[in-house]
Amino acid sequence: MATYVNDLRLKEIATGDESGTWGTSTNTNLELIGEAFSVGTEALSDASTGTITVQDGTSDAARSMNMKLSGSLSQACTVTLAPNTLSKVWCIENNAGDVVTISQGTGANVVIPNGGIRMVVADGAGSGAAITDVLDVLGGTGNIALGSGAMGVALTTGTDNVAIGENALDAVTSGTDNTAVGDNALGADTTGQRHVAVGSGALLLNTTASNNTAVGYNALTTTTTGGDNTAIGDFSLDANTTGGSNVAVGQNSLGANTTASQNTAVGVSALLLNTTGTRNVAVGYTALDANTTVSDNTGVGYNALTANTTGSNNTAVGSQALEANTTALNNTAIGYKSLEVNTTGATNTGLGSYALALNTTASYNSAVGYNALGANTTGAQNTAVGYGALDANTTAANNVAVGFEALSANTTGASNVAVGSAALDANTTGTYNVGVGYEALSASTTTSQNTGVGYRALKANTGSYNSAFGMSALQTNTTGSNNTAVGRDALVSNTTGANNTAVGYLSLYTNSTGASNTAFGAEALEKNTTDSNTAFGYQAAEETTTGDFNVAVGASAFEDNTTGAQNTAIGGYALRNNTTANNNVAVGYLALDVNTTGAQNVAVGAYALDAASTASNNIAVGYRALSQNTTGNENVSIGTDSMLDNTTGAGNVAVGMESLANLTTASSNVGVGKQALNTTTTGASNTAVGFQALRLNATTHYNVAVGTGTLYNNVASNNTAVGFEALNDNTTGASNVAVGAYALDANTTASNNVAFGKSALGANTTGATNTALGGDTLAANTTGGSLVAIGYNALAANTTASYNIAIGENAMVANTTGTDNVAVGYGALDANTTTSYNTAVGKNALGATVAEGNTGVGREALS
């Protein structure tokens, strides 16, 4: 029985009933036929030439259609296929290690690089036989053509072209690097380069253009010279002639385009009707499909810009974005149905699903976020950023909303600004409002001209003309108007209070209905509830609740006041502890600092009256004036450190630096002049007017000192000194009266002296009960007592004598130690020095007397 053993599974008859010589020959031939269609390997020797001969009637690897060349060539080798009359096709694979040239005769050869594969045919023409690469078409090189008329007969120098299909690339002459797959693909191309045409009629009319890619039936079918186009899809760019640099992906995309360039269309019928419009981008089913001649539009998404005809510079990204736009310019819509019904509205921007979805003719709007400005129809120049921002706005213009549902209920309210989630979200018709921050002005509906900046600033507001800057500033305000709050929680509790100004953290925090208050500084007027208070500074008037018409300026000024009214505190900690007292004025750091219930006080200067707690009706002007006063009332202290140490003393007046500085509990003193009554502590009812008047007086009373240095050293009581340094040295002398410059100037311990006139009793130290009236009267007296001198120079030289009486100018002018003399008249007893018991009445009476016991009455008697 016959067997089936060869590679072609042909019947071999050498066995069975057909065996015999003929059967054996037949078997051999059948095996050789099978070998011809199989794979064979020929080993090449390392030489520059070699021959592979197909043997007659015997098995031979050279007979195989797929012949592999092996070996280890170190040089190029020319292999001759023999015999030269053999006409056959081989697929030769070169693995011999170097370049192999396949030859048969003197005709053409085929060069196969190491590792290369070539399909060759030997023409068997004898000595002139040639080897041809069956895939190297006509005159070019590296070309592949499959199909009737593929690459035709015109190709001369074109290289590396591929044509598959009837008449594909059939007109090409010198074109290179083209690929045409499909009937008539690139059928008219002559010199064009780097084209790819896949599909029947693709790039059919292209002649000289280059760098086109067409995939699909009739894709780019009419293009002649337009280059750098890409068309993927049946009829894509099928009307294009000279337009270049276009991209069309999808059936009918850019289907009407003729000469326009630089368009991109991705999607069925995208840019379908475009003819000459350039630089358009359409991505999505029917995107920009009505666009004809306008340029610079971008439509990405189903029906994006689908109705656009002449509008340019538009951008639409998202299904149905700018779907109804026809002639409008410069719009940007990104998101599902963004600017969907817009027709002629220009220069709008919508980013987000339904952003500006109902806008028709309005222009210059910007919407970013889901449904932002979603209901807007004709409102212009609005800006909305955030989910639902301005989503109810219809016709209002010039609004700005940034944040989740910012201005979300606004319909016709114009010129509002809302930045922050739910900012101004209830506003409907209110205008000129500004809300910046989460829920800022969120309850405002129809009110206008409010400004709220900060978390929940003016959150509950329904009033107008309010300004709030800071977290929760004016948060609970309802109908209050004309309020200004700057700082976290400033005026946070205000409901109906109007005309308030609060600047600073917690300023006017508790105020709800109080009006016309002004608070500048953290916690200023924090607990205020009433009207017309003014506070500037940290914690100024912080505790004030119902007190009104107060003014507090300075850190912690008037801090603890509760119900006190009509007070003024200016300076850090001024009137800090005041609680219920009224009508106080404190100006200066710590002025009236500890005052609680004391009223009608005036303190001007740092530390002035700073220890006073319940004292009233005091006036302190100057640094530390009345600084230690606690309960002393009705004092007046003007000057640095004046009445510095006074605690309970009342009814004192101190004018001048350090005047009455050491006074503690005494009352009814008057000190006018620097250091007047400076050391007085408990002495009362003293009056000192002049620089250092009564300076050292401490505990004594009822002294009067008028003039610089008067009673400077005094520590006694009941003295009166008027004049420069009058009674200047007096210490313990009491009940003296000195009027005139240097009067009783040296007096120390003497008492009951009276001196009127310049230097009267000027040298007196311990002499007591003297009376001197007139300039230089008793001027030299030191210890003499019970003397009377009336008249200029009377008893002027008297030193220690006592009991003399001299009345008249120069009376007893020379007397020094004489006693018990009486001289009345000009120059009476004027020569007497040491004698005693004389009486002289009359001008110059006893004028020359120097003896004792004389009596002279009359002009110049006994002279």
Model-identified regions with their sequence ranges:
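Exposed extracellular interaction/assembly regions and N-terminal maturation sites
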Residues: 1-9, 14-100
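Tight coil/turn sites that cap or link beta-strands
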Residues: 114-117
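Short, surface-exposed terminal/edge motifs of secreted or surface/virion proteins that either
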Residues: 30-38, 98-105, 121-135
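Residues within well-ordered beta-strands of beta-sheet-rich folds
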Residues: 91, 119-121
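Surface-exposed loop/edge segments in extracytoplasmic proteins
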Residues: 108-110
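Short, glycine/charged-enriched secondary-structure capping and boundary segments
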Residues: 105-106, 854
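Glycine- and small/polar-enriched repetitive beta-structure motifs of secreted/surface proteins
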Residues: 122, 134-863
